Swiss-Prot record:
Residues 4-129 are annotated as: N-terminal SAM-like domain. The C-terminal domain binds 2 Fe-S clusters but is otherwise mostly in an intrinsically disordered conformation. It comes from Drosophila simulans. A motif (Cx2C motif 1) lies at residues 209-212. Monomer. Belongs to the anamorsin family. This is Anamorsin homolog. Component of the cytosolic iron-sulfur (Fe-S) protein assembly (CIA) machinery. Required for the maturation of extramitochondrial Fe-S proteins. Part of an electron transfer chain functioning in an early step of cytosolic Fe-S biogenesis, facilitating the de novo assembly of a [4Fe-4S] cluster on the cytosolic Fe-S scaffold complex. Electrons are transferred from NADPH via a FAD- and FMN-containing diflavin oxidoreductase. The keyword Cytoplasm applies. Keywords: 2Fe-2S, 4Fe-4S, Cytoplasm, Iron, Iron-sulfur, Metal-binding, Mitochondrion. Residues 130-161 are annotated as: Linker. GO terms for molecular function: 2 iron, 2 sulfur cluster binding; 4 iron, 4 sulfur cluster binding; electron transfer activity; metal ion binding. GO terms for cellular component: mitochondrial intermembrane space. Transmembrane segments: none annotated.
Amino acid sequence: MENFKGLQKSLYIWTDSADLDKRVEQLKAATGGDVALENVHRLSFSSYANSSFDLIVIECAQLTDSYVKLLHMLKPSGKLHLVSFIGPAASLLQEIKLSGFINCREDSPDALTAEKPGYETGSSARLSFAKKNANAVNVWKISGDDEELIDEEELLDEEDKQKPDPAGLRVCSTTGKRKACKNCSCGLAEELETEKQSQKATENAKSSCGNCYLGDAFRCSTCPYLGMPAFKPGEKVQLADNLLKSDI
C-alpha cells in the first residue's frame, strides 16, 4: 500500500465483512484520503459517476465483466489493486489489459496492480504535425497566367493547308509509287493511260469558232467543251472521259 500514498479518494470492494473495519482503516492510513465501500455483488447496480476515484481496491474477488466499469469509475492515471484474487495471475492480467488498463503487473504472488491511461475514455487530442511547406502546396496549384498556349496557326505549314490532288493519291500496290509496275494488275496502268490520253486530247483540242470559252450559249453542237463551265481564253481545260471515246 505504500505506493498509494497521497490518493484522495478510494473505493474498497469487499466480499467478506469479517475484519472489514480494520482493512478500511489500513487503506485510509496508506492513502491519507477518504475510502468508500461497495459490496462486490452490488457493484453492477451502483451508479458511481465516471472519474470518481483515484484508487479501487478489490480483495478476495474475481470480476469477469466489471473491469470496464471500474475503468470508467477511475480518474485518469488512477490505479486498480487486486489482493488475494481468485484464479491464475496471467489470466487476470490479460483480462485487465483487454479492458483498457495499462502498466499491468504482478506485485507479489497474491497482488496485482494496473493503471488507467492518463486521459479520459473517449477524449480526443489535437495531433501536432510539422508545418506544411507553402511552396510545396503551390506546386499543385494551376494558374491560368502560367499556361503557355500554342497558336493553332503555327501547327500547320502552308503545304499542310493545301488540299491534295485526288488524282495523285493512288499508288501502285507493289512499288508504293504512282507508277505502274511491269505486270500491273491493280488497274493503275489503265488509269494512268487514260489520264495520258485525256491530257493529250485536251492539248490538241482547238476552237474553230473562238467562242468556246464563253459557255454553252456560244458553242456549236459538236463543241468538245459542251456542258462544261466557261473558262478564260488560253486556260488549260481537261475534257471529260466520255468525250474522248467514240459513240460507236
